[in-house]
Design a protein with these regions (language model features):
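Nucleic-acid-processing active sites and adjacent nucleic-acid-binding tracks
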Residues: 22-54
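Gly/Thr-rich phosphate-binding beta-strand-loop-beta motif of the actin/hexokinase/Hsp70
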Residues: 1-20, 108
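Residue-level detector of anion-binding/catalytic polar loops
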Residues: 77
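Long, charge-rich intrinsically disordered scaffolds of nucleic-acid metabolism proteins
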Residues: 69, 80-158
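Short, glycine/acidic-enriched loop or turn micro-motifs at the edges of active sites
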Residues: 11, 61, 85
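Short glycine-rich phosphate-binding loop at a beta-alpha junction
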Residues: 53-63
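Anion (oxyanion) recognition and catalysis
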Residues: 72
Length: 158
């Protein structure tokens, strides 16, 4: 039995739904706030599901990182997907798709079922890559500040 957990991540809360093949709804869309109690309840619920479970979320900004980290450390398969792939995923024939957190979570869950075997697991390398990107950004900022200070000193000495 396959369980696809679709998570639409936001700053302080995430909208979550769980679906199975045949569009069977295990958990209708609901909000989970980013606090330890609710995250632990979610982890317990996901682990209690029968069959194989995969969690999928969009990696928008940095909001997804804590949720991906918590779930991954709990031993749950997590995949963070480029939002463009989710946006371009055509899962129904409707011309006008709703744009709400609940609809997004459901679309992510359907995407998870459709791409089940192709999902890449979130892991340590993703965290290291993010840390390196942050350090590189900080180094660039430092070098810009250093150059500005040198130019300022030169103009003061002239």
């Amino acid at each position: 039995m396959l369980n696809a957990v679709g998570i639409d991540v936001a700053k302080r809360k995430s909208t979550i739904t769980i679906r199975r093949p045949g569009d069977e709804i295990v958990l209708p869309p609901c909000d989970v706030h980013h606090n330890q109690t609710e995250i632990n309840e979610l982890i317990s619920y996901i682990k209690s599901l029968k069959g194989e479970t995969k969690v999928c979320m969009e990696h928008t900004g940095r909001y997804y990182e804590p949720m991906a980290y918590w779930l991954s450390n709990a031993g749950i398969f997590v995949s963070a997907v480029n939002p463009i792939l989710i946006k371009d995923f055509k899962d129904d024939d409707s011309f006008r798709a709703p744009k709400t957190d609940k609809a997004d979570a459901a679309k992510i869950a359907r995407y998870t079922l459709d791409r089940w075997s192709k999902l890449k697991q979130y892991g340590l390398m993703d965290e290291i890559r993010n840390q390196l990107k942050t350090m590189n950004r900080q180094f660039g900022f430092y070098m810009d500040q250093k150059t500005a200070m040198k130019n300022n000193l030169i103009s003061l000495l002239d």
